[in-house]
From Swiss-Prot:
This is Acetylglutamate kinase. Keywords: Amino-acid biosynthesis, Arginine biosynthesis, ATP-binding, Cytoplasm, Kinase, Nucleotide-binding, Transferase. It catalyses: N-acetyl-L-glutamate + ATP = N-acetyl-L-glutamyl 5-phosphate + ADP. GO terms for cellular component: cytoplasm. Its EC number is 2.7.2.8. Pfam families: AA_kinase. The gene is argB. InterPro entries: AceGlu_kinase-like_sf, AcgluKinase_fam, ArgB, Asp/Glu/Uridylate_kinase, Glu/AcGlu_kinase. Pathway: Amino-acid biosynthesis; L-arginine biosynthesis; N(2)-acetyl-L-ornithine from L-glutamate: step 2/4. The keyword Iron does not apply. Belongs to the acetylglutamate kinase family. ArgB subfamily. Substrate binds at G30, G31, R52, N151. The record marks K5, K214 as: Transition state stabilizer. GO terms for biological process: arginine biosynthetic process via ornithine; L-arginine biosynthetic process.
Amino acid sequence: MEVIKVGGEVLDRVEDLARVIDDSILVHGGGPEVSDVMERMGLEPRFVRGLRVTDRETLQVVMMVLAGLVNKRLVAELRSEGINALGLSGVDGGLLIAEKRSEVVDGEEVDLGYVGDVKRVNAELLESLLDAGYVPVVAPLGAGEDGTVYNVNADTAAGAIAGAVRADRLVLLTDVPGVLEDLDDPETLIERVRPEDVEELEEKGIVTGGMVPKLEAAKMAVEAGCREAVITNLEGLLEGRGTIVR
């Protein structure tokens, strides 16, 4: 069984995605869609180390776009390709119990607002859906014990889920072939990364921006019991290429 994290851009390539779904749990992002709606509402998207700063207004947009627009469109497209997809968010059924995330940048704590870390995963819920023949499609929201809803980075959510269900593989799809030493040169792909190497790659500046939560999610999943994680794009997944974390 594998956990696949996809971005909103995959909505235009669902036919290709359907080819690789087999005993899978999908977790989707939707960052560009969220930013687009925010800008139309006069809100400025802000990011710290690849994580969206989420105040109350931004959280409302995130909930609306991820749990509504992106999730339901992806489920509908997958079902049209013969995939028995079932959409839910991390709030539903206590799937993702979250707590406020604290982020330290240059030695100082940065308040990200309603950004959450996954504290606990309801693995039994996902396993029951898989046993019933469904492909769970998860929008990355979580809720605290007090009912506070949090925006959970999709890579982080996928990593936590992969570890909790002890998946054979976590696939983190992105728009590049994997972790690159030079972002402008696909030939500089780093094919293998050990979990203990992740911090060093960040400190050297090889891994920046949105790749930071991807590598950290891969590390978290492998250390929690997932056999391996792969960071790649859809072409790489179809062709068996990418960065393997194991």
